[in-house]
C-alpha cells in the first residue's frame, strides 16, 4: 500500500507510456519521486467510475490497484463573491 502513503493530499498523475514496440504499453502512476508501473501485458482489466480508477492484474491472487482521482470542490458562495469583486475591480 505504498501508493496510499505517498499520495494522500498531494497531486498525483496517471500516465500511459508507449514503448518503441507499437504493441507494448505501460501505465505509470506517480507522485514526486515515487512511481508505480504496470506493464500492459500484466493488466487484465481497467475500469473507471466517477473518481475511482481500478487496475486489475492478470494474476488473480494479486490485489487490485485502486486509485481515487482528486476532484476539485466547487467554490463556496463567499469565494464566488470575492472572485466577482476582484474581477469587477480589475475591469474598472
From Swiss-Prot:
* Compartments (UniProt record): Apical cell membrane; Cell projection; Cell projection, Microvillus membrane; Cell projection, Ruffle membrane
Which residues are reported to carry the modification N6-acetyllysine? 15
Domain FERM, by residue range, is 1-72
What are the cysteine partners in each disulfide bond?
none
Q: Where is it mainly found?
A: membrane
- What are the boundaries of the region Interaction with SCYL3? 42-92
Describe the PTM: Phosphorylated by tyrosine-protein kinases. Phosphorylation by ROCK2 suppresses the head-to-tail association of the N-terminal and C-terminal halves resulting in an opened conformation which is capable of actin and membrane-binding. S-nitrosylation is induced by interferon-gamma and oxidatively-modified low-densitity lipoprotein (LDL(ox)) possibly implicating the iNOS-S100A8/9 transnitrosylase complex.
Q: Name one GO cellular component term.
A: ruffle membrane
Q: Which Pfam families match?
A: FERM_C (PF09380)
Q: Which GO terms describe its molecular function?
A: actin binding
Print the keywords alphabetically.
Acetylation, Cell membrane, Cell projection, Cell shape, Cytoplasm, Cytoskeleton, Membrane, Phosphoprotein, S-nitrosylation
Question: What regulates the activity here?
Answer: A head-to-tail association, of the N-terminal and C-terminal halves results in a closed conformation (inactive form) which is incapable of actin or membrane-binding.
Bilayer topology annotation: Peripheral membrane protein
What are the GO BP annotations of this UniProt entry?
regulation of cell shape
Q: What do we know about how this protein assembles, alone or with others?
A: Interacts with PALS1 and NHERF2. Found in a complex with EZR, PODXL and NHERF2. Interacts with MCC, PLEKHG6, PODXL, SCYL3/PACE1, NHERF1 and TMEM8B. Interacts (when phosphorylated) with FES/FPS. Interacts with dimeric S100P, the interaction may be activating through unmasking of F-actin binding sites. Identified in complexes that contain VIM, EZR, AHNAK, BFSP1, BFSP2, ANK2, PLEC, PRX and spectrin. Detected in a complex composed of at least EZR, AHNAK, PPL and PRX. Interacts with PDPN (via cytoplasmic domain); activates RHOA and promotes epithelial-mesenchymal transition.
Q: What does the protein in this record do?
A: Probably involved in connections of major cytoskeletal structures to the plasma membrane. In epithelial cells, required for the formation of microvilli and membrane ruffles on the apical pole. Along with PLEKHG6, required for normal macropinocytosis.
Q: What is known of its domains?
A: The [IL]-x-C-x-x-[DE] motif is a proposed target motif for cysteine S-nitrosylation mediated by the iNOS-S100A8/A9 transnitrosylase complex.
Q: What is this protein called in UniProt?
A: Ezrin
Which source organism does the UniProt entry give?
Answer: Mesocricetus auratus (Golden hamster)
Task: Tell me the name of the encoding gene.
Answer: EZR
